[in-house]
Amino acid sequence: MKVSLIQTNIFWADKKANLINIEKELETLTGKTDLVVLPEMFTTGFCIDQLELAEPMDGETVLTLIRWAKEYNLAITGSFIACENEKIYNRAFFVKPDGEIHTADKRHLFSMGGEDKFFSSGDKRLIINYNSFNICVLVCYDVRFPVWSRNM
């Protein structure tokens, strides 16, 4: 499986600019990769105190991710700021080329950065079988807790 990581300049709190920027990167990967890994909170940057940036699962970010996965025939993973049941989450996603999306919310919020003051933590792991690989999608600080990610 070919995996591509996109590390690019993020436009702070500017979803539209970030979506345009990421799509330009995706266009260069057409036919060259199976899975694209996007940065944490790729549409906004790490804007923990701007809760108005949070989106529901039927918002622009998710709809765009599904379109990209289908159009470019690849899987995409990363995270974005999600809102659900009046709570805000740093939500990991994995979108398959057919548009099927799976999500889980970041479990270990980074209190030293104040993330826990604005976000709610998740309680499940995201494990995807894709191209015969089992992939455990983790967001940033979650990788510091291998026992949780391995045993939960």
Residue ranges of model-derived segments:
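Extreme N-terminal starter segment of soluble prokaryotic enzymes
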Residues: 1-5
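Hydrophobic positions in the central parallel beta-sheet of the AAA+
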Residues: 6, 36, 136-138
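Short polar catalytic/cofactor-binding loops
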Residues: 7-12
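Short, solvent-exposed loop/turn segments at secondary-structure boundaries
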Residues: 14-18, 116
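Cys-nucleophile CN-hydrolase/nitrilase-fold catalytic domain and related Cys-dependent amidase chemistry
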Residues: 15, 24-97, 102
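Short, acidic/polar
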Residues: 17-28, 143-150
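Active-site catalytic loop in hydrolytic enzyme cores
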Residues: 83-152
